Amino acid sequence: GSDPTPLAAVSFGGAVFFILFIAAIGIALGMTPLVGELYAQGDREKSAGLLQNGILFYTLLGFAMAAVQYAVIPLMYDLGQPVEVVDMAIPYYKMLVFSMPFVMLFFAFKQFLEGVGNTKVEMVVTIIANMANIGFNAVFIYGRFGLPEMGAEGAGLGTLLSRIIAPILMIGYFYNRHKYRGYLDGFSPRNYSWATVKNLLHMGLPISMQMFLEASAFVGTGIMMGWFGKETMSANQIAVTIGNCAFMIVMSIGAATTIRVSHCYGARNIGELSLAAKASYHLVLAWNAFAALVFITMRNIIPTFFSTNPEVIAIASQLLVFAALYQLSDGIQNVSVGILRGIQDVKIIMPIAFVSYWLLNLPVGYLFGFTLGMGPTGLFLGFSFGLSAAAVMMIVRIRRSVRKLRLGN
């Protein structure tokens, strides 16, 4: 359609939700390298302890995060967005908030399975949940089968229901697979061990902070886009959606890197570890070069799938060119984070993220976008600076850490 309000509302509601959502997910990601190391060493008992504590701790964390996210609702009017956008965003946002504990329960199982090198199950579960989400959206947004037309709120309800389905499927899988049922044996809140939780936090918090800082740079840029008006906000949503499609592949390469590297690290096989790291860099560079090419050559065509508004399409096509610019550094920094997680060298990624995203990305984007008057594309230029800085600093760190591991061997 040509009315930019619903798209802007979903964009804004999603952006506000995303910041704390990503922080919670980051904490859960800390489980994978720990499980991966134990898996390489064949320690089932400790792995079971990690899973069981993860289930309890992450779900509780999900409730806590949801409470915080609910509390910030009144502040959504203070971010300089058009009032009708915020009005439509809040019911959608509430549905997302209710999904938090279910997301975290799902992630406890997902990160554990990744640690033991099983990524197929999460893929199947995610595909089923996404198909369900699409079906729910068709029903709730447009009000099929005699249900009321819910619009943006319906999109939120569809997401909530699909996020409840995912952990239920995971639990079913674990109980029906002899190989995995043992990990849940004797599961009770009594097994809650503060030492294990501290271990999970020790790995998870720096990852969480890095993801929070990175996400807030993207969200901060999105909020500044809103200052240019609804059309720019919608165009930004299009560019970010397309960017996320490319980024999904990057994220999966990063996650696979963590799994491979953590297994090599657990077996103390540094030669294999270096090979895995190099292969990941080659993969991600090839993919991101391809993505950048598509962004540039298809820049006038892609936005027409999302909007019929000529102004929105024009802005989005410019943004895609600038999104192409930061593809390579985004890929490199993501794989680098994957390697650092795998060798459990995560403390450093937080300060690197702080410098890259808050001291470079956001200020440089503001400088080009507003001070130097480049407009929306100037904001995207900030990403090139921030992501490139992150990529360089992380590579320097990895070279140092791998050299240390070699000497340690």
Locations of the language-model features?
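Helix-terminus/linker motif at the lipid-water interface of multi-pass membrane proteins
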Residues: 1-8, 76-83, 139-150, 212-245, ...
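Small-residue hotspots at the loop-to-helix junctions and early N-terminal turns
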Residues: 4-15, 89, 93, 156, ...
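Residue-level hotspots within pore-lining transmembrane alpha-helices
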Residues: 20-24, 64, 97, 101-102, ...
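Short runs within selected transmembrane alpha-helices of multi-pass transporters and secretion channels
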Residues: 25-28, 96-114, 122-130, 155-171, ...
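Short alpha-helical transmembrane segments in multi-pass integral membrane proteins
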Residues: 35-101, 147-205, 261-326, 368-409
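Alpha-helical transmembrane segments of multipass membrane proteins
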Residues: 74-75, 108-112, 131, 135-142, ...
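Transmembrane helical elements of multi-pass membrane transporters/channels
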Residues: 95, 129, 162-166, 170, ...
